[in-house]
Amino acid sequence: MRLKSDLGLVLLAGAKGEFSGLSSLTLEWDERVALGVVLAAHGYPANPRKGDAIQGLPADGPDCVVFHAGTALNGEQLLSSGGRVLCVSALAASVESAQQVAYAAIAQIKLPGAQYRSDIGARAVA
């Protein structure tokens, strides 16, 4: 989320072994704070439950993106398929603001038995 430049160009140059071309690329970064909160399945880590329906995912926007990890589609139904199911990532001017954005998005997500830490970023603001 913080990299504004085209990551594809960087990866393509590296894959082609054109490392001299990498020095000509200017990487532009978003200077805002990035914060990510992982939603884990019920029973994680020892025995994560699979097959729970996931609903209420917020639309991705410039300040918040939901990354999928342990998810699967069954037709049009999104289901949990592993321990770490989603990562809600937020960008904001401060850690406190990023926390508010991320946890507001998490409040919209419906995943039975989901668990997540409520203290992400807390040490940075203490």
Model-predicted regions and their roles:
Residues 1-60:
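Active-site "cap" helix and flanking loop/linker of ATP-utilizing ligase/carboxylase catalytic domains
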Residues 36-38, 84-92:
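Short, well-ordered beta-strand elements within core beta-sheets of diverse protein domains
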Residues 40-44, 71, 93:
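Short, glycine-/Ser/Thr-/acidic-enriched flexible segments
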Residues 46-49, 76-78, 97-100:
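Extended hydrophobic-aromatic, low-complexity segments
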Residues 50-87:
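Generic long, charged, amphipathic alpha-helical segments
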Residues 92-107:
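Short, well-ordered alpha-helical segments
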Residues 104-118:
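Short arginine-rich
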Residues 121-126:
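A cross-kingdom feature marking charged/low-complexity
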